């Protein structure tokens, strides 16, 4: 009987309204674990699991996507912050980049990995051709000269939620992922109570739905093949 209650609860989650955070998300989790007010599980515990879930979802699903620029500087090839002051340490994955030339030409950069750098051909300093993401830095090669200095490279990336409070981090999460956030927190709550069957089943459902949503939204093959 309990298993059917869990399944019905999961199916109802996407249709629930959200207003005041993080209180609403705590109530959503309490609805799943069947504890309307704090008794065995405190609100602080549930909020901590929600925060952990946001990090897990944004890292696995690459769902918090945005773009920014890097301002090139003469003879500098690695950058730790963007023009908009985003720390590269908060970036989960760089999805693409292009260089904006002084003539407003847009030149796509090829992604490489750090272990490929030794295989690159000799390159004189000049306009960028390659980029890599390694050790909380974004590298851009070849080295820019004074001609390229202050020009921009625009990068598209998935990052961790950036809000200063839990309410803002929940707001950073795309709406379609929020029901999965409640499943994650509920699985952690049941684990605390040593209800490992419910915890494992809920976490497995969380992972299954997360992977399915990621495939549907972000792993779609491009409609136009690049040359």
Model-derived regions, located:
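Glycine-enriched, solvent-exposed interface loops adjoining structured elements
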Residues: 19-227
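Sec/Tat signal peptide C-region and signal peptidase I cleavage site
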Residues: 13-19
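Sec-dependent N-terminal signal peptides
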Residues: 4-13
